[in-house]
Amino acid sequence: PELINFVVWILTECSKICKTVLIIGNHDFLESNLSRVDALSPIIDSLKNPDIIYYKDSGVYVDENIDWVVYSLVNHNVRPEIDKSDNVKIGLFHGPIQGLTTDIGYKFEDGFDTDRFKGCDLVLCGDIHKRQTFTIPGKKKAYMIGSTIQQNFGESVKNHGYGIYHVNDDKYETIDLINPRPFLNFKIKSIEDLEKGNERLVNV
């Protein structure tokens, strides 16, 4: 119940600022049983808010001067057919990308390759909790946005928040959010380090 309240609150508040577009993530449904209803559909359907747009399936969705190029996990992140247009083509993707890393240094070798993003002007990605930038075909940029706040001891304290893409200027900026209750990892050589205040924070 608390999670439903939170999702309703955050989507409603975001929709007061601007039209809010979202896609499905790996925690929102059972990939092994697609006959089950996903977690987001009932919430969004009940809100009946025209400014909350849920693109569950893969496809290209025209939204004024933007073409949302949606890669859906429901459809195994297949590349949708991208037609030529004057609109800015922004890919929306959720999944691991080959070559990207986590905060503890794990490198994804078996993730999705970047060739599937050919035709996009920009791609916004979710899944890996570490914020990072990578290149897609056409020398365009893609952004793994990362987690909104630090989730556990395996993540850095800083470099979490959200990103803003300025369509007219073709610029992307990140906004950091401060976690009031961070997970802190300290390194010590002995108990004396704690007693003397010489412990070293290692996951800033």
Regions inferred by a protein language model and the residue ranges of each:
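Active-site neighborhood of phospho(di)ester-bond hydrolases with catalytic His/Asp-centered motifs
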Residues: 1, 19-26, 54-58, 71, ...
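Core catalytic region of metal-dependent phosphoesterases/phosphodiesterases
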Residues: 1-59, 116, 120
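Active-site-proximal segments of metal-dependent phosphoesterases and phosphodiesterases across multiple
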Residues: 4, 75-121, 128, 132
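Active-site environment of divalent metal-dependent phosphoester hydrolases
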Residues: 21-34, 61, 76-78, 97-101, ...
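Beta-strand-turn-beta hairpins that frame and shape the catalytic cleft
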Residues: 60-70, 84-90, 137-142, 170-171
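Binuclear metal-dependent phosphoesterase catalytic core
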Residues: 61, 143-203
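Short beta->alpha connector loops
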Residues: 71-77, 148, 193
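Conserved beta-sheet core of the metallophosphoesterase superfamily
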Residues: 103-169
